[in-house]
Amino acid sequence: MADPTPADEGTAAAILKQAIAGDRSLVEVAEGISNQALLRMACEVRQVSDRQPRFTATSVLRVDVTPRGRLRFVLDGSSDDAYVASEDYFKRCGDQPTYRGFAVVVLTANEDHVHSLAVPPLVLLHRLSLFRPTDLRDFELVCLLMYLENCPRSHATPSLFVKVSAWLGVVARHASPFERVRCLLLRSCHWILNTLMCMAGVKPFDDELVLPHWYMAHYLLANNPPPVLSALFCATPQSSALQLPGPVPRTDCVAYNPAGVMGSCWNSKDLRSALVYWWLSGSPKRRTSSLFYRFC
């Protein structure tokens, strides 16, 4: 069995090879594979009674960390310097009857193909979950994730990266391993932060937390590449059996930032259609907390 190359060392396949060869303990294998899972395509969900829902990935236009380590946001529709404390926005959302929480997609790192997801629409319905934070820290993390995914290149600066990384480090030091959703949010933010740094031409804090297809795209899609190279970063067209089981809904209720460096997947109609179909279906919405088994 061939040894994994340095670029492959963090992948699930490489971890399994090392486990079979006896080079890793069972605990290391479990942790290594679970670290490949992350949340993507976070967006706020709002709906008034039975009217058309609204999915917004751009409600947070800017994030800042104060000298005291507090998060504050510039919200959609506000001026560039109209910062709102994260706790105030948390309370505001909780008080609004239209606020439903956040929709998120569970992926492995290798399923993010830059311009699309390597998950067919039918399967995507089972990867979506609804997250309605009851704790300020979790709310801050999902808002930060949503912002990083839609961060425009003009905001992707070393100053932002350092502030966000330091804040995540503080949150991680106080997070219990039993806070499964919080740990998943932290891991997701680290994946997106390091990948965003790579795409912005800044040395990532951790090269192993750069999404693999994005790492390749950073080099291969520069300088107007031929279509054959661009096609590598779009998922393979799926058969009709893997499409949505009903009529494709309208997707004009999904708001995202086309200029977001990490948000190009939002251009995929399959993703937007699956999101709206999932929400409008009569089936109960899986909660993000239910993604984890309880052993005690």
UniProtKB/Swiss-Prot annotation:
Keywords: Host cytoplasm, Host Golgi apparatus, Virion, Virion tegument. One of its GO terms (cellular component) is host cell Golgi apparatus. Its main location: virion. InterPro entries: Herpes_UL7. It is found in: Virion; Virion tegument; Host cytoplasm; Host Golgi apparatus. It comes from the Viruses. The keyword Transmembrane does not apply. Pfam families: Herpes_UL7 (PF01677). HAMAP family: HSV_CEP1. Belongs to the herpesviridae cytoplasmic envelopment protein 1 family. Plays a critical role in cytoplasmic virus egress. Participates in the final step of tegumentation and envelope acquisition within the host cytoplasm. This is Cytoplasmic envelopment protein 1. The gene is UL7.
